Design a protein with these regions (language model features):
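Hydrophobic alpha-helical bundle architecture
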Residues: 458-472, 479, 683, 687-690
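Extended, hydrophobic alpha-helical segments in both membrane/secreted and soluble proteins
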Residues: 442-456, 469-483, 634, 651, ...
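Non-membrane alpha-helical structural segments and their capping/turn regions in soluble enzymes
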Residues: 284, 328, 332, 447, ...
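Asparagine-centered strand-capping/turn motif at beta-strand->loop junctions
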Residues: 753-757
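Aromatic-residue-lined binding/catalytic grooves and analogous aromatic/hydrophobic interfacial grooves
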Residues: 4-437, 444, 455-457, 475-478, ...
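Core alpha/beta catalytic barrel or barrel-like domain that forms the active/cofactor pocket
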Residues: 412-414, 442-455, 491-499
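C-terminal capping/lid segments that line or modulate ligand- or cofactor-binding pockets
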Residues: 33-55, 60-61, 99, 114, ...
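Short, well-structured active-site flanking segments
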Residues: 347-356, 392-393, 460-467, 476, ...
């Protein structure tokens, strides 16, 4: 359902990003490739003229994991607590991890496995000029083009949602198309490529037959993965060396490629050969079908804050950001790119979007799993307000598939009922696998994920799914916390061991010289984040139980726990404490911002709705985080926090620093600045691509423009000074859609609200305008309450002096 009154300019340049250079990170070209995908299959285009590589990944292809039986070590919890009660934090820290290792537990997370490379070797007889790489985000098409003297070459591809295949077209305007195409095991400069080849041995198959190329390898489970490629064109086609197809003197060739994961290669080869033999649709016809599906998702929401520099290349925009500040054009492009990645990188009935999306370029990358102590949450923050609610169902289905593992975790690690979710998981692996205290002793994952799942219900109103999966999941999480929490001598809840991800209290650090040590002693008592998560979960599950009539016998016990949760504490400087314990002091040289949870990503304290004293303490706590301890994702997180605190210039400054330090020319975000310029932590030789920051930026932009909660929304709550005008189309609140357009210098504001379900809420209108009218009638103040039935609409405008006079006369 679209709101028709607010129109946004459909300038094609807004949805295209242009690069003037190919991927060029030495020995790691994949980092700067351009991504295409249909939510299940990903293609990453390097853009090299003479020796092109397109890396193919499939969401269900993982390898090199290890699963073994989880031993029962629940007795370790009581011993850990004994040591914590004595103040022996260091002794308590490793008890559980050491016992697991002693009992021989050696689980290991799997990693995404690149499926293959599509290789294109081309003659290059003359020096190139006018080189471009272009990603069209509204269609999902990647195009590489260049000229050699007066001859023009283009190579373009997309991964079809409609037909579940990659379609690739190569053209030359002078019949100078000479190319050799083949499929191969993905090549890297890592020793892992050699390991893969040795593991495959005779299982690796690559051959060409007529105009078809076949490729297959075998995974650890004994099942095959591979590809079948068909090539058609007007040049001279011939097989070469038994594994490739050459094209001579062509104007145009089209490549159709299907991929499989699982099954048996000969069966899959025959299946896809039959499919492609009868395939006669042109590239353009296939693109039209795909673009219709892709575009419907991409365009269901829009944000425009830029009116210049829209045609500048990524390199130009990033260079300008490096000089001082990110332009509106770059911020808007980053927002669009975050949405594009999400739409292209995950799908219904697929798997959650991992940290590398569908575009990993190595066989064993750091943090390539689904990490739930920050990262997967950040990846999905933007989806509800951004109109991509469907993606959350995939996340819940993924975690639901691991429930048996999670129940065993709770019993065998802690002697508790319900579920314990380890921070890191991969498909089919829900047991703990990072056997270190900072991960093993953190209990917040299940509760934090419940926030996302319950938001899915609130934004969709899907009560059937609430009853079927969301509320049962919340119930199991609540059962665990009910068992895990103890009462102290004052009758307050006590949570221990309790980890504030991945931080260690300053008072437990071994010395100032170890200030940047990763996490020496994180197992503490009463982390603020744990209380915030438990409080939010129990409030939500009580509400959901009353809506559905389920779990009525548990409500009283949940209410008892809620009443016993202590108030958040402040330290001597007035900032919120990260650990609510007298012996644990705050450590500011850290990237995680977990104790700010009640402000963001939670909504326990909202500026303009709640006690103003508490948010000041949260702001102080954020402001003391040191710049040289941050990462790409933490800067995005910090921007979201400052937006919630209505500090727009601080929020946009975080994005300025992020784009200056942790963004590659293809707009992939990094964990840390590889150039060591003092804007982030020093990651040493490790500079991982992490797309959580891509999504975090998308969310930060949305948070600046719109705050949404159950019964209170704010328009332009943290609009930075540089966003003087702009337009928003169809952002989502929980029961409807909102579109608005503003021009601060012109005194112009118009907002349209469409109620999809019965709506009752308060709106905080922008502070930049002072006289408002609803449906043409003047209103007092800027926080009106509204009540709309499903299907009703409301128009709010800012009035000039003349308009107000005319309204009053009427």
């Amino acid at each position: 359902m679209a709101i028709g009154v607010i129109h946004v300019t459909q300038n094609g340049n807004r949805n295209k990003m242009t690069l003037k250079t190919p991927a060029s990170w030495h020995r790691d070209m994949w980092r700067e490739g351009l991504p295409a995908g249909n939510g299940k299959i990903g293609a990453l285009v390097y853009g090299n003229i003479a020796d092109e590589t397109i890396v193919i990944n499939h969401c269900k292809l993982w390898h090199w994991g290890k699963r073994n039986e989880l031993p029962d070590i629940h007795e370790a919890l009581s011993e850990t607590r004994k040591q914590l009660d004595k103040g022996n934090f260091w002794d308590a820290n490793t008890i559980s991890a050491d016992l697991l290792k002693k009992k021989g537990y050696t689980a290991r997370l799997a990693s995404p496995c690149p499926l293959c490379d599509i290789k294109v070797i081309m003659d290059s007889k003359n020096a190139f000029h006018h080189y471009r790489r272009v990603l069209n985000m509204e269609t999902g098409e990647v195009c590489v083009s260049w000229k050699e003297e007066d001859c023009e070459f283009t190579r373009k591809l997309f991964v079809s949602r409609a037909d579940d295949m990659l379609v690739y077209k190569l053209t030359s305007n002078q019949r100078h198309l000479n190319a050799n195409l083949f499929l191969q095991l993905h090549e890297t400069y890592d020793k892992d490529t050699k390991k893969m080849r040795e593991e495959q041995g005779s299982n690796l198959v690559e051959y060409a037959d007529k105009n078809f190329i076949y490729y297959s390898a075998r995974n650890e489970d004994g099942r095959d993965f591979g590809a079948v490629m068909k090539i058609v064109g007007d040049g001279d086609l011939a097989t070469q060396d038994g594994r490739s197809i050459s094209v001579k003197n062509g104007n145009e060739i089209t490549v159709y490629c299907c991929f499989f994961v699982g099954g048996q290669r000969n069966t899959e080869f025959e299946k896809y050969k039959r499919k492609l033999e009868g395939w006669n649709d042109t590239y353009e016809a296939c693109l039209k079908r795909h673009a219709k599906l892709h575009g419907a998702l991409f365009h269901n929401v829009d944000i425009q804050i830029a009116d210049q520099d829209l045609d500048k290349s990524n390199e130009e925009l990033l260079f300008n950001a490096y000089e001082q500040t990110a332009s509106n054009a770059l911020i808007e492009r980053m927002w669009r790119f975050g949405r594009y990645l999400m739409i292209s990188g995950t799908a219904e009935n697929g798997l959650p979007f991992p940290l590398y999306g569908l575009w990993p370029g190595k066989y064993r990358l750091p943090w390539s799993h689904n990490m739930a102590n920050e990262n997967i949450q950040m990846i999905y923050w933007h989806t509800m307000v951004g109109g991509l609610e469907y993606t959350m169902k995939t996340v819940l289905d993924y975690y639901w598939s691991l429930m048996d593992d999670f129940r065993q975790n709770a019993r065998r690690l802690f002697g508790c009922s319900g579920i314990y979710i380890p921070a890191g998981t991969t498909p089919g692996m829900g047991y703990p696998n990072q056997i270190v205290p900072v991960i093993l002793n953190w209990i917040g994952a299940a509760g934090w994920l419940c926030q996302h799942f319950y938001d899915y219900y609130k934004f969709t109103g899907d009560e059937e799914f609430l009853k079927e999966k969301i509320l049962p999941f919340m119930y199991e999480a609540a059962q665990f916390y009910s068992d895990y929490i103890v009462m102290d001598e004052k009758g307050n809840c006590k949570i221990y061991p309790s980890v504030s991800p991945e931080n260690t209290p300053k008072s437990l650090m071994p010395g100032d010289e170890y200030e940047h040590m990763a996490h020496p002693c994180p197992s503490a008592v009463n982390a603020t984040m744990d209380f915030a998560i438990v409080k939010e979960l129990f409030r939500n599950i009580i509400e959901a139980s009353k809506i559905t009539g389920m779990y009525q016998d548990k409500i009283k016990s949940w209410e008892t726990i809620l009443k016993a949760i202590p108030e958040y504490q402040k330290n001597a400087d007035g900032d919120i404490k990260e650990w609510m314990h007298p012996d644990l002091t705050d450590r500011y040289t850290h990237r995680h911002l977990s104790h700010i949870y009640p402000v963001f990503p939670g909504k326990e304290y909202v500026i303009g709705r709640d006690d103003m004293d508490m948010p000041v303490g949260f702001e102080l706590a954020v402001s003391k985080r040191t710049p040289d301890s941050q990462s790409g994702w933490s800067l995005a997180h910090m921007a979201c926090i400052y937006a919630r605190l209505e500090k727009p210039e601080k929020a946009i400054r975080c994005l300025d620093i992020l784009t200056r330090s942790c963004v590659l020319k293809n707009l992939f975000t990094l964990h840390n600045d590889w150039r060591k310029m003092g804007l982030t932590l020093d990651g040493g030789e490790s500079v991982p691509v992490q797309m959580d920051a891509n999504m975090g930026i998308a969310n930060a932009v949305q948070e600046m423009l719109l705050f949404v909660s159950d019964d209170f929304i704010k328009i332009l709550p943290a609009c930075p000074e540089r966003f003087k005008k702009g337009a928003v189309k169809n952002l989502h609140f929980m029961t409807g859609l909102i579109s608005f357009k503003w021009d601060i210098l012109a005194g112009y504001f118009v907002c349209n609200i469409a109620s999809l379900r019965n709506t009752r809420l308060t709106i905080q209108l922008p502070k930049f305008f002072h006289r408002y009218a609803m449906n043409g009638h003047s209103i007092d103040g800027r926080t009106p309450g509204i009540a709309l039935k499903a299907g009703e609409r409301l128009c709010i405008t800012a009035q000039t002096d003349k308009e107000e006079e005319e309204t009053n006369l009427a």
